[in-house]
Amino acid sequence: METTGEVVKTTTGSDGGVTVVRSNAPSDFHMAPRSETSNTPPNSVAPPPPPPPQNSFTPSAAMDGFSSGPIKKRRGRPRKYGHDGAAVTLSPNPISSAAPTTSHVIDFSTTSEKRGKMKPATPTPSSFIRPKYQVENLGEWSPSSAAANFTPHIITVNAGEDVTKRIISFSQQGSLAICVLCANGVVSSVTLRQPDSSGGTLTYEGRFEILSLSGTFMPSDSDGTRSRTGGMSVSLASPDGRVVGGGVAGLLVAATPIQVVVGTFLGGTNQQEQTPKPHNHNFMSSPLMPTSSNVADHRTIRPMTSSLPISTWTPSFPSDSRHKHSHDFNITLT
């Protein structure tokens, strides 16, 4: 069969199939003729095509390739999968052990050439060295020292009672010394010693608030007679704002209940009577001042007979210069 401008060839096979080939058909549409001499049975299956060539790329080979060059440490979490999608096997060793680090520990067990050189300590200049002062030996402390046996007490004085008498009666209950610390309350009458040389006393009557009260009463033993020595000093404020004070030389009558804080402790009389033990002193000797023969030995113990030092309070009322002898004055403040 022929057509205009085209050539058609028809081939009939033994199985009755027809193959049509056109001369002007593109090469992509050409079909290969079936071989008639093929001995392949019709029900046979064609062999599968050969698999495509695969790349023999493994993580170990990649690590071997990178081992020759320097390894760049990356930040962040390591990859879980490689470029081909296969799981990456992590090394059991930590990252810190991958690259050896320089040790800063000095090994003293090696030879002397490899030992670290220690720089000697710089000597401190003598100008920066503080001198050490030695404390003077004051003798041995007895187990019954004043600091260990100081006991505070509160004495309550009722209205109308004498504060001085109440404190002295409390001190006579034992052989302890009495130290008056403070007091609060109001007094109605007080007798104070004059600060001038006349030796007189002044008595103030009225209502005075106690600002401060202090004093000491020490036990003394003179010719087998035990007594108390000491005194008190007081500062008072009047209702009009004036302040009077001085050594208590007589009554100190309470106008309201007064609380007095005192402390009891062991006196130093028994400790001074003991013979002092010789002690070695390593202090520099200083030249002694010449002393007269009538000066008593410093080891002689004298009982305390004088009271507290006279205060420098000045009386609120001027004293009359005509009185040249010891006189007592009774002054009432309203």
Swiss-Prot record:
Bias type Polar residues, positions: 90-103, 306-319
Primary site of residence: nucleus
Domain PPC stretches: 147-287
Gene3D superfamilies: Hypothetical protein, similar to alpha- acetolactate decarboxylase, domain 2
Span list, region Disordered: 1-103, 109-128, 306-334
Coiled coil: none
Locations listed in the record: Nucleus
Domain of life, per lineage: Eukaryota
Pro residues bias spans: 44-54
PANTHER family in the cross-refs: AT-HOOK MOTIF NUCLEAR-LOCALIZED PROTEIN 2 (PTHR31500:SF117), AT-HOOK MOTIF NUCLEAR-LOCALIZED PROTEIN 9 (PTHR31500)
Protein name from the UniProt record: AT-hook motif nuclear-localized protein 2
Organism of origin: Arabidopsis thaliana
